[in-house]
């Protein structure tokens, strides 16, 4: 995980304009961007004191709509400097990664080090600065593999990189065993805290106001906005985690259901969930994975996701009943079977053909949810 010091503030205007020209931006548009970037002023106010104006000679405005876009265009050629590693970037969050076996660990780390030096050289040429003290290094693998190897220190820019057991990437905590235990524990702790705060102010929502008498909908809206929206964030990445973690997430939904219904802590919650028509967390995760697969199969997802899946009809020409089903990837480990690729193929192949052939993602989601809800209520 690379850490770029003051990335947005370090953009060199002339270099950015040159890159925009290389990308085919017209002279008239370049003049507009030059005017947009140049001669910007900034001042600092502390209480009633106001500093003198200072001209900004580097960087793009943070908090603006164009800021992230211009930064992405600025680092657009970064992946091309690496010969072995893959580079993924989201605005100023960049990471280098490569795959190697246990026997190839020394060679893999040498390749990683060589590409890190190339990235450092690119950053120097583009007037960006890598902070080695905050750049993190993590090796992912199975418990067996990690227990059999010794990770040598990786030196970069004269300093040993921090070897960590987990990294946080765009809000998802990736631990070295990809168990997502830390992510789930952190998520549950955070959401339980929010629910506790909501419970303390619930009496306010229960009080009739000028605008509404029945406030159950208001309470549900608050819980949905603050809790459920975070509960399923990036779930396709981690929903293959163990049943114990799914059970922890179910406790969050149970707490929310008790708040909505006024049930006590030790009251049986399943009838309440059915009364509120709340599907269990495992079913909601299933729906989200299925919706993601629908996107992949109907060109609604990025190509790097869609190309991970192959129809059986693409591998042979036999007119079998399941020729439109997906080819299940070979997985030698339980960890691989938790991946979205394996899980997604299993889910998609299990769906009825009429459901897979839905004309829109809205109808697909509604029909799938309706079927699961009907089954859940009748159990």
Please name every model-derived segment.
Residues 1, 44-70, 97-104, 154, ...:
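Short, conserved non-catalytic motifs in the polymerase core
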Residues 1-3, 20, 33, 63, ...:
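Short, conserved catalytic/metal-binding micro-motifs enriched in Asp/Glu and His
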Residues 1-61, 98, 295:
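Conserved pre-catalytic core of RNA-dependent polymerases
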Residues 4-9, 22-25, 59-67, 103-110, ...:
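Conserved, non-catalytic sequence blocks in retroelement Pol enzymes and Pol-derived host proteins
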Residues 68-97:
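Active-site palm subdomain of RNA-directed nucleic acid polymerases
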Residues 120-138, 245-314:
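Short, charged alpha-helical motifs in flexible N/C-terminal segments and linkers
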Residues 129-167, 324:
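Short, conserved micro-motifs composed of acidic
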């Amino acid at each position: 995980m690379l850490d770029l010091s003051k990335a947005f503030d370090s953009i060199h205007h002339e270099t950015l304009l040159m890159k925009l020209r290389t990308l085919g931006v017209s002279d008239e548009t370049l003049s507009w961007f030059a005017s947009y970037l140049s001669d910007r002023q900034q001042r600092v106010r502390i209480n009633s004191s106001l500093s003198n104006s200072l001209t900004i000679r580097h960087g793009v405005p943070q908090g603006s709509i164009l800021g992230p876009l211009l930064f992405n265009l600025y680092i657009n050629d970064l992946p091309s400097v690496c010969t072995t590693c893959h580079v993924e970037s989201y605005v100023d969050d960049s990471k280098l990664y490569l795959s190697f076996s246990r026997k190839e660990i020394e060679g893999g780390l040498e390749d990683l080090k060589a590409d890190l030096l190339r990235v450092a050289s690119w950053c120097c040429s583009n007037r960006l600065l890598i902070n080695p003290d905050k750049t993190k290094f993590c090796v992912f693998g199975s418990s067996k593999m990690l227990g059999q190897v010794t990770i040598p220190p990786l030196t970069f820019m004269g300093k040993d990189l921090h070897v960590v057991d987990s990294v946080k990437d765009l809000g998802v905590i990736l631990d070295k065993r990809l168990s997502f235990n830390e992510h789930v524990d952190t998520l549950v702790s955070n959401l339980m805290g929010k629910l506790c705060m909501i419970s303390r102010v619930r009496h306010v929502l229960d009080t009739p106001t000028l605008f509404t008498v029945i406030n159950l909908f208001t309470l549900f809206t608050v819980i949905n906005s603050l809790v459920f929206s975070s509960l399923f964030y990036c779930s396709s990445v981690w929903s293959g985690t163990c049943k114990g973690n799914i059970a922890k997430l179910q406790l969050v939904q149970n707490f929310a259901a008790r708040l909505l219904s006024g049930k006590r802590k030790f009251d049986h919650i399943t009838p309440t969930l059915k009364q509120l028509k709340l599907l269990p967390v495992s079913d909601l995760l299933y729906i989200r994975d299925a919706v993601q697969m629908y996107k992949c199969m109907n060109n609604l997802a990025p190509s790097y996701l869609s190309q991970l899946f192959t129809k059986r009809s693409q591998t042979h020409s036999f007119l079998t009943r399941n020729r439109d089903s997906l080819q299940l990837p070979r997985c030698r480990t339980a960890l691989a079977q938790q991946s979205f690729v394996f899980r997604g193929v299993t889910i998609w192949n299990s769906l009825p053909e009429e459901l897979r052939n839905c004309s829109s993602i809205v109808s697909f989601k509604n029909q799938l949810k309706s079927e699961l809800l009907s089954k859940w209520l009748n159990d």
